[in-house]
Amino acid sequence: VDFTNRMIDVFGDQQASLVPALGDFFDGFRDLALDASSRVRRDQLLSSASTVTARFRELADRLSAFDLESKEALETKVEQFNELLAQLSLVNAKLIKVQDLSKQPPDLLDLKDNLLRDLSSYAKLVVKEESNGSVVVGLGSFDRKLLEKAEFGRLDIKTSSDRGSSIQLELSY
């Protein structure tokens, strides 16, 4: 949402807007067509062409900066998610050692619940609690298990440039 609002601000900014610059540019062509020999009108057209070029460059620079910033933010979020998942796998490993839920340490169960809550702020999770209090965690559905027993998957970011800049999340074990 933050990136979207900032993009709207950039494209809505009158100083960076292409609309007036393109209008001046095409008006310059119209004016030059009326008097093709006018040196002043040629210079005005060249000036408006320079303005349009500068606006395109400025917008391209801003979009590149947004692209980089959004990728870095995504990388940070994925790393935080992976760290929480690793912590939950350690908790799960301890919970698996005790078969009876009533004999599990309450602070360990609380830690598990807190980690699940934190993880769910990053992605839609499906959680199945076992009889001993350990959990099986899926991403969106159980066909993509993130955590089972003490085994967990790690999310990785894969980028490709075959169609511009494409980002995919991959789950690996």
Features from the language model and the residues they span:
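Phosphate-proximal small/polar/acidic motifs at interfaces that engage nucleotide phosphates
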Residues: V1, Q87-L90, I96-Y173
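Alpha-helical heptad-repeat coiled-coil segments that mediate oligomerization/polymerization in large
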Residues: V1-M7, Q14, L18, S38-L45, ...
